[in-house]
Regions:
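PAPS-dependent sulfotransferase catalytic domain
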Residues: 81, 85-211, 226-235
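A short, structured active-site edge motif that brings together acidic residues
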Residues: 34-38, 110-115, 212-217
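Pocket-edge structural micro-motifs
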Residues: 33, 86, 253
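PAPS-dependent sulfotransferases, especially Golgi type II membrane carbohydrate sulfotransferases
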Residues: 1-6, 154-158, 166, 173-175, ...
Length: 276
């Protein structure tokens, strides 16, 4: 079966799991958990470029075929015509998509206010206080106190998942790849799901599928306990609605002042460089 590949990236705690649960209602679409496809492609490419064995007798056409086959082999067990691969680094790797997968990438990017993302992480850590989250483990290893301010600073540090995702997402703008990216605002998705999904299908150039936003099911669960120390990191409620608190109810003035108004994608008209 010939398969079309689309991509999900964007920011954490911005509804990507919810969004994939909606897309999975379409019988033609497969949206699995986070994928290692890009990493496998990257490290295979690095091997061919640096390995003594590969350099001693280079076969560039065969190297290209091997890397190009990664995504087909990874999804060989999926019998659906449209595959949605999730990796937060796709916007920073449009060139690899074009070189090895398709010349016309379509990357779906759920996004959200940065302070809402931080507030969501803090609430989740508090809900799972009987576990040691990946955030608290990093702080303990570095000798920092387990305060909410420190948690937010870690998430926004170069080692933190929020900053890393912002960087990869921002590189899509820096490389003039906006035309390959469709942004899905979290608050639009939960407040106006049908209108938001119609825009998604229009971007994908697929016929619209009528979704049931009151009967959602998360099919592909990640090992959140083992990997993140947060048992409900990728939970999806059956009925679509917004239940999170406002950031002002969760975060300190220090965090609110430091990380407000970072949503560059709402005002970017040209390549940007936030990460100098």
């Amino acid at each position: 079966m010939n398969k079309d590949y689309i991509f999900v990236s964007g920011l954490p705690r911005s509804g990507s799991t919810l969004f994939k649960s909606i897309l999975n209602q379409n019988p033609d679409i497969h949206c699995g958990a986070i994928s290692p496809v890009l990493e496998i492609m990257y490290y295979t490419e690095q091997y061919f470029e640096k390995s003594e064995q590969a350099l001693a007798y280079p076969k560039p056409e065969q190297h290209h075929k091997i890397i190009s086959s990664v995504i087909d082999n990874y999804y060989d067990d999926v019998n659906k015509p449209i595959i949605c691969d999730k990796c937060r680094a796709w916007p920073n790797n449009v060139d690899r998509i074009q070189k090895y997968i398709t010349k016309t990438p379509k990357i779906l990017c759920p996004v959200r206010d940065v302070i809402e993302i931080l507030a969501s992480f803090i609430q989740m850590i508090h809900r799972n206080s009987n576990q040691v989250s990946f955030v608290d483990k990093a702080l303990r290893d570095a000798g920092y106190a387990l305060t909410d301010d420190n948690r937010c600073d870690y998430l926004m540090s170069p080692e933190g998942i929020v900053d890393q995702s912002l960087y990869a997402f921002g590189e899509g703008f820096n490389k003039n790849c906006e035309k390959y990216m469709h942004l899905i605002e979290y608050n639009d998705l939960v407040s106006h799901p049908e209108k938001t999904m119609r825009k998604v299908y229009q971007f994908l150039e697929f016929p619209y599928y009528s979704h049931d936003f009151e009967n959602l099911n998360h099919k592909y669960r990640e090992r959140d306990d083992d990997v993140y120390g947060l048992s409900d990191m990728h939970e999806v409620r059956k009925k679509l609605n917004k239940v999170s608190k406002r950031p002002e109810e969760v975060l300190s003035d220090y965090v609110l002042n430091k990380y407000s108004n970072m949503e560059f994608w709402r005002k970017a008209k040209a390549p940007i460089n936030l990460f100098i």
